[in-house]
Amino acid sequence: MQYYGCLMIKNGDADGLVSGACHSTANTLRPCLQIIKTKPGTKLVSAFFLMEVPNCEFGENGTFIFADSGLNQNPNPEELAAIAASSADSFRMLVGAEPKVAMLSHSTKGSAKHDDVTKVVEATRIAKEEYPDLALDGELQLDAAIVPGGGRVQSAGQ
């Protein structure tokens, strides 16, 4: 089924493909990479979940993208920055709104010390440097990212 769907996209008979619930990630992505290929200049393939929460005041009227929780294992800071930018592009294209990117972590603005936190802080720095027009902040826990003022409560020393 994935091959047929990918051929339809390649031929302009479909705009997208929803897949993966009944197939492994590898079996879902393989046809896409073989038939559709990646966008020119793409160095890293990543995945995201598009979430729509009804009657939600957060996100873009309840719409969020969470990336990359399904493909890249333990990405380095440069890869995290690239994933953030790529996901922002996908959000713009699919939702038609300007993304607000949060680099998620188990720490908010230094509330915890760990190598994983350091990696997200560095990824945030890289993303801000390489994509200066992107509305981006980090490192943030999810509630601090979506609840106005939530980050002030969870930041270092509180």
Model regions and ranges:
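Anion-binding alpha/beta catalytic cores of soluble intermediary-metabolism enzymes, centered on
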Residues: 1-158
